Amino acid sequence: MQHLPAPIHHARDAAQLPVAIDYPAALALRQMSMVHDELPKYLLAPEVSALLHYVPDLRRKMLLATLWNTGARINEALALTRGDFSLTPPYPFVQLATLKQRTEKAARTAGRTPAGQQTHRLVPLSDSWYVSQLQTMVATLKIPMERRNKRTGRTEKARIWEVTDRTVRTWIGEAVAAAAADGVTFSVPVTPHTFRHSYAMHMLYAGIPLKVLQSLMGHKSISSTEVY
């Protein structure tokens, strides 16, 4: 990312996971990794904060902040309901069902979970700003716990974000364009999955063991985590 204008430096409405990082070293490491196209492309915390600054709508901002604070795949984030969150201090967390597990579960008629397969993972929510803003969004937008399915007539758990992957990509594109208008650019293309890669790298910078990160990311194989 290029230099940030003064308003970004002083903005406090953008989320940063509370971890101290040697940013000059982190920038140098990322510059080296960009030589290899096959390695994950990610943003550093100040860049994520800058991007969120250009998302004025609280509902949109909190979806992107959820991707950043949890490392969720976009399908996982869009499936979240209020019941998946426990925001009670001192240890708030979110329960995520991994993408592949959700797909397999929908395809099984017997509803049995394959032996040894964990269907959900718990991800701690360490950013108090994020937790507070999520509570504000739920209260302000009056997001219900359940709603009636107009097609089936059944009462179902209400998803927090009733949008599609394409819509989220549009939101991100609009934020990137707004940032560019202020002279703020990003070193990598930004997609929903960029936030997942960014979360993983941020956790590694914080000293999280690889096996723990594997669990947080919902990787079945450690080899998937080792790409970071």
Residues of each region from the PLM?
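Basic, Lys/Arg- and aromatic-enriched nucleic-acid-binding interface segment
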Residues: 45-74
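N-terminal DNA-binding recognition helix of tyrosine site-specific recombinases/integrases
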Residues: 1-28, 73-75, 174
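Short basic/aromatic active-site micro-motif
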Residues: 165-168, 186-206
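DNA breakage-rejoining catalytic core of tyrosine-based enzymes
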Residues: 20-49, 104-128
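Short, polar N-cap/turn motifs at the start of nucleic acid-interacting alpha helices
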Residues: 85-89, 189, 208-228
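Conserved tyrosine-mediated DNA breakage-rejoining catalytic core shared by Y-recombinases
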Residues: 79-136
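Short, charged phosphate-coordinating catalytic segments
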Residues: 67-90, 211-212
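Active-site/catalytic core of tyrosine-dependent DNA strand-transfer enzymes
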Residues: 126-186
